[in-house]
Every structure is written in structure tokens, then in C-alpha cells.
């Protein structure tokens, strides 16, 4: 794919993400796998319970839209087995639509499947699922996907899970990085810390959570006087390459307009077609503000291309609203 063509595709994906963001439901699958010991079990339990509380109590995820799996079965928590994971995604395939959003969050241990470093497993209770198998499970799920693998063996998941319009995060940028990670704690914390809301919009986007957690990981290693053994990556172009939070790159445009919490409520007209146009205009206006916020990180040509695309579509939608009003 040419460098010239890539920005145009990114613009299209951002517009699509922005346009559908307010329309659908939100689902989440939060999994902490086999712990391998009491210390790890305590850590993973804390991450899981904190994150599910945020999704449920702060963001308002419905009980039947939030699937939680862990090493030990308990109330509203299934055992994290291969069979239960597969069953969850069979259910989601039936229930979700193209306008819905799904978050998949993995915390625990990850291991490489062989010496090539091309594939890895997320450790479950009993038989595991490899990155390739996760990709097969999720490719039939409709809607938008945010996939976050916070394990030490997460890097191979980046290129296995990457696809057009998806947002994929991993805790590591190399198959050689297989140590226990601190990324999950900081990623979860981002959604409860006003400091993560760098654009002061009142909400934390996936990109802002990624930036927040990446900076916290770096600071954690600096304070310990150690070289980092994890460097988080984010991919949302589908290229499967990704970028670090402070590195240049095209990735991040969709993540900047992707949120876990529902979109703010709009006062919508009773006419369904007109209501859809009002939603799209609001989403485009949000995308425009996001683009302005990252102007300094873009080349003049790329900024102009994205700005023209958004303004052109915004003008078209505004004319349609005027004609129907």
C-alpha cells in the first residue's frame, strides 16, 4: 500500500468510526486467565474487578453486555476455559450488529507457541487459545472491535488481530519481551484518572488511555532504574505494525475517536432519517475537533487531506439536515 493512499484510507475509517459511534450498543469481554500463583492471582483479580466496576458502574454497561471470565468461577464470572471463551463469542456473533462496539481485554500470562515468535497463546484454565485462534473467533463478529492484550506474550497478537477499522493494543513490541507486565494496571487506571483526559473533553479515548499507560510504564521502569522490558503498541490502520505512543506514525486516528463509554445523549428529532443525520453531524464535529487537536503531529499535506474530507462530509450532511428540517 502506498504512503499516499494510506492517509485517505485512514480518513475513511475515521469517518466510519465517528459516524457509527453513537448508534450501537457496547459489549465487553474481560478475561484474566490462569495465574500461576497467589501473587499473580491477586494482581489479576484487582485489575479485573477494577475494570469491570468502571465498565459497569461508571460507563453503564448492561449486565448482559459484560462478559467476565477468570481463573475461579464466581457470581457473574465464568471460569476462563477455552470452551467458555468460544461460547461467549458464539453468543456475541448472534447478538451484535455492525453498529455495535466490542471491547476484548486480556490480562494474565502469554507464551510463544514456538521458537519463530510468529504466534503466541493467552494462558487459560486448561487448553489455551493461540493468537491465530483468537483471530478466527473474532473475524466473524460484526461491529467495531477494540482488542487489548496486556500480557508479556502479546506482541504476536498485533499482526494476527489487526484489520481494517480495528483498534489493537499490545503490552510489548517484540516477541523477545515476555516478562510480567505492568501495562494492565495503568491502562485500567486511565479511565478513572482525569489526568488521562489530555484534550479535556470530559472523556478518555482509547488513544488517551494508551498514552497514559505507556507513559506510566516508562516512568515505572525509570524509577526502578531498569531498562524497559515492555513497550506498548497500538495499531488501528490494519497494517499490523503499530506504533508507540510517542513515536511518529499513522496509527491512532481511529483510537482517538473511540471511547468505551456511551456517546453523550443528543436531542434527536422524531423523524428517523433526520435523527440519523443529526447523529452523523455530531460525530463529524467530534472528529473535526480531534483532528485539530493532533494537527501538530501531522504533515501539512496529511492534515489538509483529513480536514478536507471531514469538512466536505460535514457540509453535505448539514445540507441534508437543512433540506429535511
PLM regions: where:
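Bacterial N-terminal signal peptides
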Residues: 7-18
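Active-site-proximal C-terminal subdomain of hydrolase catalytic domains
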Residues: 49, 145-236
